[in-house]
Structure formats: C-alpha cells, structure tokens
Curated annotation (Swiss-Prot):
Membrane topology annotation: Single-pass membrane protein
UniProt keywords, alphabetically: ATP synthesis, Cell membrane, CF(0), Hydrogen ion transport, Ion transport, Membrane, Transmembrane, Transmembrane helix, Transport
GO molecular function terms listed in the Swiss-Prot or TrEMBL record: proton-transporting ATP synthase activity, rotational mechanism; proton-transporting ATPase activity, rotational mechanism
Family, similarity comment: Belongs to the ATPase B chain family.
Annotated localization: Cell membrane
Gene Ontology CC: plasma membrane; proton-transporting ATP synthase complex
Top-level taxon in the UniProt lineage: Bacteria
Gene: atpF
Organism: Bacillus anthracis
Keyword Hydrolase: no
Descriptive protein name: ATP synthase subunit b
Matching CDD domains: ATP-synt_Fo_b (cd06503)
Length: 168
C-alpha cells in the first residue's frame, strides 16, 4: 500500500530502498571520503598551527634581534661620542702644547734678538768712541801744527764733523 508523502503517493518499497541507499552512501562516504577528508583537514589544521607557531617564534626572534640591534646601535653611538670627546680633548691638549712651544720659541728668539741688538749697540759705541778719539787726536795735532785763530779752529772742527758724517 502506498504511503502518502506531501500529498504524493510514493510506494513504501521505494522509500525503504531510497533510505537504504542513502544510509549505505553515508556509511561509504564516512569510511572512504569523510575519514580521509577529516585526516587531510586535521593535517592542514596541524600544518597551519605549526606555521603560526613558527611565525610567532620568528616574530619573537625578530623582535629580539631588533632589540639587540637597537642596543648595539645605542652602544655604538655612545662609543662614537666618547671617541669624539677624547679627540676634542686631545686636540685641545695638543693646541696647548703647540702654543706653549711657540711662546717659548718666541721668547728665545726675542732674547736672542735683544742680545744681538745689545752687542751691536756696544760695538757701535766702541767704534764711535774710537773714531771720536782718532778725530780728536787728529784735530789736536792739526791745531798744534798750526796755530789757528778761533775761527779757523771752529771751521776745522766743522769740516771734520762733516767728514765723519759723510763717512757714515
């Protein structure tokens, strides 16, 4: 006897056969398709989880490396600043040494020049004294040789002084 399903007459055998085939299909799908599909999905899930873990580890390692690089950069900057400060101090020290040496050399040159000037002054005075003495002797001998009037003596002295001025 046919059973009515949704107002349509479908024989019971067809329903039972269709139900049996459907259940058989479900069992076969579960055994042959669902298991392998679930296995593949499980593998894929594990693979994705492993990839996420690896990415997180890599990210953590990258952050650690970035922090290390920042520390190294900071240390390099500190060392560079210290090096610059040492170089500046060394330059100032060298400048002080050079300036002191230049002052010492200038004082030495100045002292030497003063000594040279003093020596030349003494030589000039000695030469002048010798010349004056010589001229005095010459004038005296000429005055003695001839007795001159006062005018002639003055003229003679002026001539000798003029002669000495031209000789210089």
């Amino acid at each position: 006897m046919p059973t009515l399903l949704l107002g349509a007459a479908i024989p019971f055998g067809t329903i039972a056969y269709t139900l049996f085939i459907f259940l058989l299909l479900l069992v076969m799908l579960r055994k042959f398709a669902w298991g392998p599909l679930m296995g593949i999905m499980k593998e894929r899930e594990e693979h994705v989880a492993n990839e996420i873990d690896a990415a997180e580890r890599n990210n953590a390692e990258a952050k650690k490396l970035v922090e290390e690089q920042r520390e190294m950069l900071k240390q390099s900057r500190v060392e560079a600043q210290e090096l610059i400060e040492r170089a500046k101090k060394q330059a100032v020290d060298q400048k002080d040494v050079i300036v002191a040496a230049a002052k010492e050399e200038a004082e030495s040159i100045k002292a030497s020049a003063v000594q040279e000037i003093q020596r030349e002054k003494e030589q000039a005075i000695a030469a002048l004294q010798e010349q004056v003495a010589s001229l005095s002797v010459q004038i005296a001998s000429k005055v003695i040789e001839k007795e001159l009037k006062e005018e002639d003596q003055v003229k003679l002295i002026r001539d000798y002084i003029k002669e000495v001025g031209e000789a210089r």
